[in-house]
Amino acid sequence: MRILVLSDSHRDKISLMMAVKLHREADVVVFLDGEEDFQCEKMSSLLSLKEVHSVRGNCDFYSSLPSEETFACGGKTVFILHGHTRGVKHGAEELLRAAKEKCADIVLYGHTHIPKSEYIDNMYVMCPGSIRDGSYGIVDITDNGILCYTADLSREL
């Protein structure tokens, strides 16, 4: 299973569409900053066959999306959130505590705009950075394990 992870678009639909087109093979697409990013017609048509998960970000004041979500993917528990409600700009302690409470195997968060992928306390923890700046994340879940990494649109095109 492949998860494409996108965050902090700040309404840059062009970069979002480029990443989705580049990774059409992804089974799941995760948006870590709100529903407006995939509302346009072109984005919806690109994602029509994908499993999509989205949480609201710090600028999504009127969004009906949840601030956090947990879902199963490839036999693993994935915990997603934008991160601002868990203080990720000031450290990962609160984020990790919440993830442990959810029994998460994989934690995906945004808000910092800093691409980072780590293995902490038996969890894969990733911030994809900001797609507006060309940064996004990939999570591959296979029989051999989990691989989380960040990528850059400018290097992929």
Question: Over which residues does each language-model region extend?
Answer:
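N-terminal active-site segment of His-dependent metallophosphoesterases
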Residues: 1-49, 60-62, 66-67, 141-144, ...
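Active-site neighborhood of phospho(di)ester-bond hydrolases with catalytic His/Asp-centered motifs
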Residues: 5-7, 28-34, 53-58, 79-82, ...
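Charged helix-capping and loop-helix junction motifs
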Residues: 90-98, 123
